[in-house]
Amino acid sequence: MAGHSKWANIQHRKGRQDEKRQRVWTRVMREIMVAARMGGGDLGTNPRLRLAVDKAKAANMPADNVKYGIAKATGSLEGVHYEEVRYEGYGFGGAAIIVDCMTDNRVRTVAEVRHAFSKHGGHMGTEGSVAFQFKHCGQLIFAPGTSEDKVMEVALEAGADDVITHDDGAIEVLTPYTDFEAVKKALEAAGLKPELAEVTMRADNMIELTGEDARKMQKLLDVLEDLDDTQEVFHNAALDASE
């Protein structure tokens, strides 16, 4: 099943994360703390915490930092309490954007998100204005050249919903968010290591943006991602700035 180009967007995202490791660590630490506060500090019974710890390992965060974050969240140490908030809006060409944040000050966060939208050509919407265009699911991305047949066989057997081969050769596995961990483990046990593995909000349909609109949209997304309280930015824009 063919789809739109995927690999360049993944590499852009990974490149920005590599450039800003400390910011990535901060975001992962917030996720660890919220996951541990909501579900407890036991990795064996808290799948959200397990996923957060996996992200910490992928970001090369020291194990002591992870333990410290769990301890703060579960009451062993004093710490800041974060809450999760979601903002929705629009970018260029009517593209939909979701900004998930963790904050200790909602007033500050909403002001920063609204300013980023308005200054860079987008605008904020109301709650629920764009979220219906996305599906909460597990997503695993494999590099071009990975065996499509092997990925498909293992993933579907383990409970994946779909396997998509994109035009650039990247392979995308979609799972129910509740089955993400089981599918990921099955693929890794078969020697198939994804370049990206996460529970995400995946757009049902993409909006193609080219040229100046694509460049402006990328700038808006980058600014939103760089806000201190941002955890994740999801959108439905397929960007091609080459024209």
From Swiss-Prot:
Record keywords, A-Z: Cytoplasm, DNA-binding, Transcription, Transcription regulation
Primary localisation category: cytoplasm
Pfam families membership: TACO1_YebC_N, Transcrip_reg
GO molecular function annotation: DNA binding
InterPro entries to which the protein is assigned, alphabetical: Integrase-like_N (IPR017856), TACO1_YebC-like_2nd/3rd_dom (IPR048300), TACO1_YebC_N (IPR049083), Transcrip_reg_TACO1-like (IPR002876), Transcrip_reg_TACO1-like_dom3 (IPR026564), YebC-like (IPR029072)
Subcellular location per the Swiss-Prot or TrEMBL entry: Cytoplasm
Organism: Polaromonas sp. (strain JS666 / ATCC BAA-500)
Family according to the record: Belongs to the TACO1 family.
Source organism, top-level taxon: Bacteria
Region (Disordered): 1-22
One GO term describing the cellular component: cytosol
An annotated GO BP: regulation of DNA-templated transcription
Protein name as it appears in the record: Probable transcriptional regulatory protein Bpro_1967
HAMAP family reported for this sequence: Transcrip_reg_TACO1 (MF_00693)
